[in-house]
C-alpha cells in the first residue's frame, strides 16, 4: 500500500513537472505580441537610435565597452539579466539624458514600450539582487560621468541587435 502511494505521488510529480516545463516552453508565444510586431519595433528603434546618436557628442572613449561579448551571452540566456540591462538603460542612461525635443522623448517612450512588450513575452521571476555584470557596468557608467551617457547611447545598436537575436532564437 505504501509502495502504491509512493508510485502515485511520483507519477503526479512527473506529470506536474512536464506540465510546468511545457508551460515555460510556450510562455513566449502564449502571452506575447506577434514576433513580427516586436521585430518591427526593434527595427524602428535602430533608426531612431541612429538619429539619437547623431544628436549627442561622439563617444571618444574607445578602450571601454559597457556591452561586452560575455554580457551578450548572459543577455541571451538569463531573463533576469535581460530585465536588469533594460532597466539600466531606462533608468540610468535615459534618466540622465537631457530630454529636449520631441524625438528624444519619443525614442525613450518607444524603448520603454518595447521593454514592456518583452516582459510580457519572457516570463521571469524577478530578483531583488543585482547581477555582478550590471553592477560592474553601472560602476563604469557613473565613473566616466556624462561620457557614460554618450558611451551607452553609442552602444544602443549593440543592445538592439541582441534583442533582435533573442527574438529570432525564441521562434
Curated annotation (Swiss-Prot):
Name the Gene Ontology molecular function terms of this record. cytokine activity
Q: InterPro entries under this entry?
A: 4_helix_cytokine-like_core (IPR009079), IL-10/19/20/24/26 (IPR020443), IL-10_CS (IPR020423)
- UniProt induction comment: By Herpesvirus saimiri infection.
User: What name does this protein carry?
Assistant: Interleukin-26
The places in or outside the cell where this protein is found are: Secreted
Q: Does this entry carry the keyword Cell membrane? A: no
Principal localization reads secreted
This protein's source sits in the domain of life called Eukaryota
Question: Which family is this protein grouped under?
Answer: Belongs to the IL-10 family.
UniProt keyword terms in alphabetical order: Cytokine, Secreted, Signal
Purpose: May play a role in local mechanisms of mucosal immunity and seems to have a pro-inflammatory function. May play a role in inflammatory bowel disease. Activates STAT1 and STAT3, MAPK1/3 (ERK1/2), JUN and AKT. Induces expression of SOCS3, TNF-alpha and IL-8, secretion of IL-8 and IL-10 and surface expression of ICAM1. Decreases proliferation of intestinal epithelial cells. Is inhibited by heparin.
Q: What's a Pfam family this protein contains?
A: IL10
Question: Which tissues express it?
Answer: Expressed in HVS transformed T-cells but not other T-cell lines or primary stimulated T-cells. Expressed in colonic T-cells including Th17 inflammatory T-cells; the expression is significantly increased in serum of patients with Crohn's disease (at protein level).
Q: Which Gene Ontology BP annotations are present?
A: cell-cell signaling; immune response; negative regulation of epithelial cell proliferation; positive regulation of cytokine production; positive regulation of ERK1 and ERK2 cascade; positive regulation of phosphatidylinositol 3-kinase/protein kinase B signal transduction; positive regulation of receptor signaling pathway via JAK-STAT; positive regulation of stress-activated MAPK cascade
Amino acid at each position: 500500500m505504501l509502495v502504491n502511494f509512493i508510485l502515485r505521488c511520483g507519477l503526479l510529480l512527473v506529470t506536474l513537472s512536464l506540465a510546468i516545463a511545457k508551460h515555460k516552453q510556450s510562455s513566449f508565444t502564449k502571452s506575447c505580441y506577434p514576433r513580427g510586431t516586436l521585430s518591427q519595433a526593434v527595427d524602428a528603434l535602430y533608426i531612431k537610435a541612429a538619429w539619437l546618436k547623431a544628436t549627442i557628442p561622439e563617444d571618444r572613449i574607445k578602450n571601454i565597452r559597457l556591452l561586452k561579448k560575455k554580457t551578450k551571452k548572459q543577455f541571451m540566456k538569463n531573463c533576469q539579466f535581460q530585465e536588469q540591462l533594460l532597466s539600466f538603460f531606462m533608468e540610468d542612461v535615459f534618466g540622465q539624458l537631457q530630454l529636449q525635443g520631441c524625438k528624444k522623448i519619443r525614442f525613450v517612450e518607444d524603448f520603454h514600450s518595447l521593454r514592456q512588450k518583452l516582459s510580457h513575452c519572457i516570463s521571469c521571476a524577478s530578483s531583488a539582487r543585482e547581477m555582478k555584470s550590471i553592477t560592474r557596468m553601472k560602476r563604469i557608467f557613473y565613473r566616466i560621468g556624462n561620457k557614460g551617457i554618450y558611451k551607452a547611447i553609442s552602444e544602443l545598436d549593440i543592445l538592439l541587435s541582441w534583442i533582435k537575436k533573442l527574438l529570432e532564437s525564441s521562434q
